[in-house]
Amino acid sequence: MSSRTGHEKGRRTSQSKTGHFKRSGKPNRVEDQTTRRHPTRTAKAKAKAKANKPRVDLQNRKVIIFNKPYDTLSQFTDGDGRKTLADYIPVKDVYAAGRLDRDSEGLMVLTNDGILQAKLTQPKSKSPKTYWVQVDGAPQEQDLEKLRKGVELKDGMTLPAKVEVIDAPTIWERNPPVRFRANIPTTWLAITIIEGRNRQVRRMTAHIGFPTLRLVRYSMGDITLGDLQPGQWKEIQL
């Protein structure tokens, strides 16, 4: 899947795996009260929101995949002079389907198709997202099992994740390098989730006692990072 490319500096390539999970969740109190008092109003609001998502025919649809470098914002503008998507991607009228933290790296999908955007980001679509995560320390199976069952964060219980220990992926070196503690080992994990809460994966690994040192998103649904290097982008056909 390829056509147009754009590039900056980068070094090596990558591979990994994906997974899928069951959906569950709790409405917050305000949403619950609104549903009880005005069920038809809530249904109308949902229908209106769905109708407002731009539908684009296949001939006009744009889908960009991008390897976001470390220390780059997942947006096109910034008033403080920090690096943004605009420093790398000249394509107009495309929007990110899910963000990455400034200190995270890897796959971003940008599109002008609101339906595709929702499919990749909304938990109800059960679209898996796989991250390669380097953690401080050496988690054991009983630690990883907690993530597989779900952990309680400040914003609620996480859905079950697919988690496995992997060999260190053959990818580019981060700039700046990750800071290691000489006497503490590090471990690479492949973590697959269907949610997208703020800094969720980092909070999950911290919750079980193994802080994230480096986080690289490898895939979203069936879309993978492939051999894109940091700062490179490519327009694809789905």
Swiss-Prot record:
Protein keywords: Isomerase, rRNA processing
Lineage: superkingdom: Bacteria
Catalyzed chemical reaction(s): uridine(2457) in 23S rRNA = pseudouridine(2457) in 23S rRNA
Signal peptide positions (record): none
Disordered: annotated segments: 1-54
Top-tier EC class: isomerase
SUPFAM superfamilies, per the entry: Pseudouridine synthase (SSF55120)
A Pfam family that the UniProt record links to this protein: PseudoU_synth_2
Biased composition (Basic residues): 9-26, 36-53
EC code: 5.4.99.20
Disulfide bonds: none
GO terms, biological process: pseudouridine synthesis; rRNA processing
Active site per the UniProt annotation: D101
MF (Gene Ontology): 23S rRNA pseudouridine(2457) synthase activity; RNA binding
Function summary: Responsible for synthesis of pseudouridine from uracil-2457 in 23S ribosomal RNA.
Family: Belongs to the pseudouridine synthase RsuA family.
Protein name: Ribosomal large subunit pseudouridine synthase E
Organism the protein comes from: Vibrio parahaemolyticus serotype O3:K6 (strain RIMD 2210633)
Protein encoded by which gene: rluE
